[in-house]
Amino acid sequence: MIHQTGFWHKDFAEPHHIHSPNVSKWICEFLSDKKNNQIYDFGCGLGNYLNDLHSNKFTKLIGLEAEPPKTDYEFKINSQNLAHPFILDEKGIVICLEVGEHLPKEYQDVFLDNIANNCSDYLITSWAIKGQGGYGHYNELNNDEIIPEILKRGFTYLPEKSNEVRLVVEDFCSYFRNTLMVFKKD
């Protein structure tokens, strides 16, 4: 089901992953002038957000998932445990939704360092707040706890953009209204 480092085994992931079409549309519009930039989705699950980007003519897309799903997408989903250090061949924009809270606290720094070391532009992320609950939430943190952790890794928080994306969230994934955050790499 859920690995000790927080990733979901693929058979467990399929029925439990939630995709927000409104958030995905917002991401496509927000990044509309970055269609030829490298974009990664860390902990991409089934690859739904990347698939929406691909449908909107984004060209350089790679998903990272510890146990990649079998798909017929025209982009790659590579096997990568986010709790272990890694450097990708090219830095890029990073999307990382509903991932950090699934890693036990002991892997938090490596996970955040992986994001920082592989991001060259925007980071669009979320982190479940304390008390939110959810399958395999080992490390829920309030915004005022996780934002400084990301800032100290060379990012600037973009509160206006964060609030903008939170406003489009559908009711079935209302937790995103408290957890979505947008950053820019310094």
Predicted regions mapped to residue ranges:
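Short glycine-centered segments of the SAM/dcSAM-binding site in methyltransferase folds
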Residues: 121-124
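Conserved N-terminal segment of class I S-adenosyl-L-methionine
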Residues: 1-91, 95, 106-118, 129, ...
